[in-house]
Amino acid sequence: MTVKSKSRISHYEVLGVPVDASTDEIKLTYRKMLLTLHPDKSKTVPIDSTIKIRSGVSINQIQEAYRVLSNDQLRAAYNRALNDSNKLAGFNNFGDGLDEFNLDEFEFNEEKLEYVMTCPRCQSGGGFVLSEDMLEECIEDGLTESEEQGYQVLTQCTACSLWLKVNFFINDEEE
C-alpha cells in the first residue's frame, strides 16, 4: 500500500484523531464530521465544538480516511506504509526525532572491521559506517551503560542529514 495524499496529510489528520484511536472513536468522529459538513443536516443538528475540520479537507478525503482506518487490515497496511514513508522522509514516531537501530541490523565487514548500513532515507549504500575502534572509543568516553540496555551511539549518514541512535552490547567472551 502506498500512502498518497494530494494535501500530504495523513488519514489520521483528515479525521483529526490520534494514531492510537479506537475504531469506535474513528466511527464517531467520522459521523460527526459528515453531519457537520452535510448541507441539510448541519442546520438541524447542533454543531459539535469538539469536531475540528481542517481547511481544504473534502468529503471524499474524509470518506477514504474512514474506509481505511475503520478496517483493521487496511489500517495495519496503511500504518506500515505511513511509517515507511515517514522513515524515507527522515521522520519517525519517537519524541527525540531519531530512529533507533541495533548494531545487529548492520552488515559486518570483516576486512575493515566495520559495521555498515544503507541509509533508510537516501538509500546510500555506505550511509552509516561504525568501526569497532569507534565503538570502543565511545565506551571509553563514558557512554551510558546498563545491564539491560547496553550502549548507545549517535551517528549521521555520510550522504544526507539523517541521524540514528545505534544500540549495541559488548561480548565479553575474550575475558
Curated annotation (Swiss-Prot):
Keyword Zinc: yes
Record-annotated DPH-type MB domain positions: 97-169
Similarity annotation: Belongs to the DPH4 family.
Organism whose genome encodes this protein: Candida glabrata (strain ATCC 2001 / BCRC 20586 / JCM 3761 / NBRC 0622 / NRRL Y-65 / CBS 138)
Keyword Secreted: no
Entry text on domains: The DPH-type metal-binding (MB) domain can bind either zinc or iron ions.
Limits of the J domain: 10-82
Single biological process term from Gene Ontology: protein histidyl modification to diphthamide
GO MF annotations, alphabetized: ATPase activator activity; ferrous iron binding
Role noted for this protein: Required for the first step of diphthamide biosynthesis, the transfer of 3-amino-3-carboxypropyl from S-adenosyl-L-methionine to a histidine residue. Diphthamide is a post-translational modification of histidine which occurs in elongation factor 2.
Pathway named in the protein's UniProt entry: Protein modification; peptidyl-diphthamide biosynthesis
Underlying gene: DPH4
UniProt: Zn(2+) binding residues: C119, C122, C157, C160
A Pfam family the protein falls into: DnaJ
Domain of life: Eukaryota
InterPro entries according to UniProt: DnaJ_domain, DPH_MB_dom, DPH_MB_sf, J_dom_sf
Name of the protein described by the UniProt record: Diphthamide biosynthesis protein 4
Main localization of the protein described in the UniProt heading: cytoplasm
CDD domains found in the cross-reference section: DnaJ
